[in-house]
């Protein structure tokens, strides 16, 4: 046997097997296309649609999160401004209240001083009136005694001293 005959015979066997393999492969492909390709293709399409939907949903959620973050940032900034305004108003109110309290206290103190001065002036006036009355009474009493009896200078001095001692008691 020569190499050509071996090659020809072996080539012929391989060609027959190759045709058979091709035929089986073609039948297998037709069966796959008919029974499996549709469901696999549908499954791949559903998967593609789900991925697209998930990406769209993620983008939407990200936009919502950004919007919410911006709203919260704005609310935080607004609340800080409100807190600053409240503190400012509280300080202003406290200063105004303090001024009002001091003014009221000054008015009360002035009224108390005025009343005390008036009372002191009245007490002084009353004391002076009482002293005048006593001096007048003493003068009248001395005059009565002097008139009732003619006294010497020594007797007059003793009489005045007795009246002064009587005032001390």
From Swiss-Prot:
Keywords: ATP synthesis, Cell membrane, CF(0), Hydrogen ion transport, Ion transport, Membrane, Transmembrane, Transmembrane helix, Transport. GO terms for cellular component: plasma membrane; proton-transporting ATP synthase complex. The chain crosses the membrane at residues 12-32. The keyword Ion transport applies. It is found in: Cell membrane. GO terms for molecular function: proton-transporting ATP synthase activity, rotational mechanism; proton-transporting ATPase activity, rotational mechanism. Pfam families: ATP-synt_B. Induction: By low pH. CDD domains: ATP-synt_Fo_b. Its main location: membrane. Increases 2-fold following exposure to low pH. InterPro entries: ATP_synth_b/b'su_bac/chlpt, ATP_synth_F0_bsu_bac, ATP_synthase_B_chain. The keyword Transmembrane helix applies. It is a single-pass membrane protein. Belongs to the ATPase B chain family. F(1)F(0) ATP synthase produces ATP from ADP in the presence of a proton or sodium gradient. F-type ATPases consist of two structural domains, F(1) containing the extramembraneous catalytic core and F(0) containing the membrane proton channel, linked together by a central stalk and a peripheral stalk. During catalysis, ATP synthesis in the catalytic domain of F(1) is coupled via a rotary mechanism of the central stalk subunits to proton translocation. F-type ATPases have 2 components, F(1) - the catalytic core - and F(0) - the membrane proton channel. F(1) has five subunits: alpha(3), beta(3), gamma(1), delta(1), epsilon(1). F(0) has three main subunits: a(1), b(2) and c(10-14). The alpha and beta chains form an alternating ring which encloses part of the gamma chain. F(1) is attached to F(0) by a central stalk formed by the gamma and epsilon chains, while a peripheral stalk is formed by the delta and b chains. This is ATP synthase subunit b. It comes from Lactobacillus acidophilus (strain ATCC 700396 / NCK56 / N2 / NCFM). The gene is atpF.
